[in-house]
Each structure stands twice: as C-alpha cells, then as structure tokens.
Amino acid sequence: MHAVNTLTGRPTEPVLIAGAWRTAATVSSFRAVDPTTGQEREQLWPVSSWSDVDAALDAAGATAAELARLPGERIAVFLERYAERLAARGQELVAVSHAETGLAIEPRLANVELPRTLNQLRQAAAAAREGTWRMAMIDSARNIRSAAFGLGPVIVFPPANFPLAYGALTGGDFAAAIAAGNPVIAKAHPGNPGVSRRQSHLP
C-alpha cells in the first residue's frame, strides 16, 4: 500500500542525520495506509526538504573516507553484532512488519524473511572479513595492479513487499554496501515507515 500525502497537522517523528536525531525540515507529511482496511493510520511522518537531503549527503560524504579505511574485520564485527541485535528483536520486528504490510507472520516473515535477513548480514560480514570481494589482481608482466573499492555514499530505497530482507537498514543492498565500506543513506518506504523506525532504534 502507498502512503497518503497530507499537509494537515505536523509530524512528530524526527530524522536521523549524522548520528543524531533531529526535527525534520518538513515540506509535507504523510500517513501510511493499513493494508488490511485501506484506512490511513494515525501517525504522521515527515517528508524532508532538500536541506535534510543535502545534510545527509554531506554527512555520508564526510564519513566515506573514514569508513573506507576501516579494516574488514571491524566492519565484519559490526555486521555480526547488528545481526545479533536484529535477532534479539526479531519477534518485535516481525510484528511491526506484519502490521504495516499485511504479510503473514508465519511462515512468511518469521520463518522465511527474518532468517534470510540475518543470513544476508552474516554473509556480508564474512565477505568483509575475507576481502575476496575486492578481486585483487596483479599482472606482473604489465606491472598492473587492480582491486575493487567502495564507491562512497549509497542510498537504499526499499520496496514495499520485503520490509526486512530488502529493508533500507537491514536488506541485502544495505549489507553489501556496508561490507564494501560504503556509508548508507536509508530512506524508509512510505508504506511501512515504522519498520525502518524500529530498525534504527535497536538497543
């Protein structure tokens, strides 16, 4: 389901930029739609202005060089610990995902999508640790050396129907970007913004 845009009221949800929650520079707001009833939900969510977008891009750009220098082991440990925290809150994340998307708790979310999500993060951790994704090559005859590196900030736009496995903060795109040393700008899907909100508040 798509969210419904509205200019009535003021959203209370903040945005997370450069590691800090702040009031959104709102140009409009929206309410997600309950997929089981077709009715708007009560919670108002902000639609950020270009100033928020620019701030997120600036923060990600400033972080890119630092993240690119991190050893693969440190990135791997982060991804593994993140997967552990997601697993610990799995039941809660599944419940929110079900409420916002209407997808079945079992077997779809709890038995298929959540395990897949955790596995993706752990596979990304293994790739970061091994470094094989760099595909380093040395051509001694031509004195050419090559290797893959992170590209810089990556923006993840999640779909409506995979709130966890393709989520902006948990999905395969997120995991691959982090494993390769890229900072991520995550945009919540307007149909299930509460899922991303919950993912961003892991203890």
Regions found by a protein language model. Name each.
Residues 134-203:
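Conserved small-residue-rich beta-alpha loop and adjacent elements
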Residues 1-141:
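N-terminal Rossmann-like NAD(P)+-binding subdomain of aldehyde/semialdehyde dehydrogenases
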